[in-house]
Amino acid sequence: MSLNDYPQQVNKRRTFAIISHPDAGKTTITEKVLLYGNAIQTAGSVKGKGSQAHAKSDWMEMEKQRGISITTSVMQFPYNDCLVNLLDTPGHEDFSEDTYRTLTAVDSCLMVIDAAKGVEERTIKLMEVTRLRDTPILTFMNKLDRDIRDPMELLDEVESVLKIHCAPITWPIGCGKLFKGVYHLYKDETYLYQTGQGSTIQEVKIVKGLNNPELDNAVGDDLAQQLRDELELVKGASNEFDHELFIGGELTPVFFGTALGNFGVDHFLDGLTEWAPKPQPRQADTRIVESSEEKLTGFVFKIQANMDPKHRDRVAFMRVVSGKYEKGMKLKHVRIGKDVVISDALTFMAGDRAHAEEAYAGDIIGLHNHGTIQIGDTFTQGEDLKFTGIPNFAPELFRRIRLKDPLKQKQLLKGLVQLSEEGAVQVFRPMMNNDLIVGAVGVLQFDVVVSRLKTEYNVEAIYENVNVATARWVECADSKKFEEFKRKNEQNLALDGGDNLTYIAPTMVNLNLAQERYPDVTFFKTREH
């Protein structure tokens, strides 16, 4: 590769994730995006009936049964002279930690809103996470083939609840059975909707000009007039698109459409490739790393077990921050101080894996992991630096895991530690007994753990209630005081999967008392990986 080629390769990368409330249509949008990127030939309807293919991006056994994307997969596809990396985030309300971490690996997000429902609680939470890094947001108002709320009201709600300015790019003409298409405010064009084009891409009829009589013929006089009246109002009351405000995360361009009807998806893809930022610089402990730097750096934001049921393997997902990966190159695994030769990294089309010959800043590659890589690990071409800002949250729910066969204790521990390194669950081993306590941010995670212990480690386990209300990581600068604290609180102390000391409190009152009694000890609710 010539040196001139490198900036060009980086500049055409766009790495984004989709955030939404469960059932707002995220998986359908993911499919349609892949259809436009020529990554899949036909878009199957997500909850396929036995014979139909399941949605391409949901591939684990339990996901197949439940029809939810439990794990984050990565898909790369070309679009408009760009190379787009889409990180699929878990759509189920339980899987927040994995989602939060995925959002640290993208440069922009698409927020999908069910236009019949408006802003929902999960979207609010996810937006808070994107705020931590001022991630630019594009918005897609979905499901216009159903009856929706007033579009102006939807924009007002996004602005007041999510505290972000809206700049409509397209505007809907009717909805539900009367949905006729959208008008593009900046191109002065109307795109007409036809039903029944869900799984393939078809030519869309375009009418130029808002006052073109063809428009009245196509959508009917009433809807055409309604559109003109609404646009007068919209132009007066809403924000114009401003690229700088968008990049700063203060303004979101809004598109309307229906993912199921495969309409409007290309409009936001055009917006994404034209406006969303190229791979961005990233804060490390010693300096800021620019994506234009020639030397390779990257961080691991997710670990996933058994992406290939035929291979009992685990894959660490690494976001390339700078430089170029080439097959067989030597990288430094900074945390353990070892050099490793990476000869078989993977690139992704969800569920299909290909060996990566090369990857650039902004890309995600998969590293085969035999238990040495953890979330938050940094890889470089020799420099000692660690990327920051990959969070671990104190769990909110706890269960004790118990074996049906007590002789399998070793396999159980191995399985739980691996699942905790992967970020699927957190595991705590109390100092005073041989219990194994798992902590999660949502109930469904416990089911996932039990089912994966069985399928992947051949361990039959059950979970039961345990007297733990919350957990905090503890540290203290004064070793003498820390020793005293540890001696007096042994019954409440445990080690997590990474052997970090944790205080497990039976009640919030107990935690508050401990914090009052030991002011020199710091109790952390989150910690960096």
From Swiss-Prot:
Keyword Nucleotide-binding in the entry? The reply is: yes
Any one biological process term the GO annotation gives: regulation of translational termination
| Family annotation (InterPro entries) | EF-G-like_DII (IPR053905), EFG_III/V (IPR035647), G_TR_CS (IPR031157), P-loop_NTPase (IPR027417), PrfC (IPR004548), RF3_C (IPR032090), RF3_dom_3_sf (IPR038467), RF3_GTP-bd (IPR041732)
Keyword line: Cytoplasm, GTP-binding, Nucleotide-binding, Protein biosynthesis
- Does Protein biosynthesis show up as a keyword for this record? yes
- Pfam families with a match to the protein in the record: EF-G_D2, GTP_EFTU, RF3_C
The terms describing its cellular component in GO are: cytosol
> Which GO molecular function terms does the record list?
GTP binding; GTPase activity; guanosine tetraphosphate binding; translation release factor activity, codon nonspecific; translation release factor activity, codon specific
Q: Where does this protein hold GTP?
A: 20-27, 88-92, 142-145
Question: Which family does the similarity line name?
Answer: Belongs to the TRAFAC class translation factor GTPase superfamily. Classic translation factor GTPase family. PrfC subfamily.
User: What NCBIfam families does this protein map onto?
Assistant: prfC (TIGR00503), PRK00741.1 (NF001964), small_GTP (TIGR00231)
Supply the name of the protein: Peptide chain release factor 3
Lineage summary: Bacteria, Pseudomonadati, Pseudomonadota, Gammaproteobacteria, Pasteurellales
